[in-house]
């Protein structure tokens, strides 16, 4: 747990971009981003457990303003409906779900990339119509 003041000091001292990770289990937890939004470059909303993340209701971050760069984690699977996450966040962290027994699983990675490519193609078609 790093306070906003400590975060500001670290950013100033090292002149690096900062990702602040918040553990989310309720709407009240989401609002903690307000303390960091002017300091951190990215706010990571994650479930409890980090590496062995417990999921949370990802829709809780819907009301976080678009000008806040959001990263979403929390038990997101490689074969989940990615479109629903893309609508509410800038970055999706699903690294752990791409592993089997602690090693990257190329089958899972390929499924994820195919699903992501379908979304990209769909969005390109949609944008070319508008």
Describe the function of each predicted region.
Residues 1-5, 47-52, 88-109:
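Glycine-rich phosphate-binding active-site loops on the catalytic face of alpha/beta enzymes
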Residues 1-11, 16-35, 41-54, 71-74:
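Catalytic beta/alpha-barrel core
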Residues 5-7, 25-39, 61, 66, ...:
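Catalytic cores of alpha/beta
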Residues 9-13, 95-130:
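C-terminal helical cap(s) of enzyme catalytic domains, especially alpha/beta-barrels
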Residues 10-21, 58-78, 112-118:
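Alpha-helix-loop-beta-strand connector modules within alpha/beta enzyme cores
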Residues 25-26, 40, 53, 59, ...:
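Generic serine detector
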Residues 28, 49-53, 72-77, 100-104, ...:
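Short C-terminal domain-edge/linker segments immediately following a structured domain
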Residues 43, 57, 61, 85, ...:
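Conserved, mostly hydrophobic/aromatic
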């Amino acid at each position: 747990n790093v306070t906003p003041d400590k975060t500001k000091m670290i950013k100033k001292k090292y002149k690096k971009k900062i990702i602040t990770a918040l553990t989310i289990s309720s709407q009240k937890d989401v609002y903690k981003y307000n303390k960091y939004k002017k300091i951190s470059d990215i706010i990571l909303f994650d479930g409890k457990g980090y590496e062995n993340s417990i999921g949370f209701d990802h829709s809780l971050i819907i009301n976080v303003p678009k000008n806040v760069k959001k990263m979403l984690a929390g038990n997101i699977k490689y074969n989940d409906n990615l479109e629903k996450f893309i609508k509410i966040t800038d970055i999706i962290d699903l690294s752990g779900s791409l592993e089997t027994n602690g090693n990257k699983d190329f089958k899972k990675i390929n499924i994820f990339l195919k699903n992501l490519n379908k979304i990209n193609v769909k969005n390109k078609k949609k944008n070319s119509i508008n």
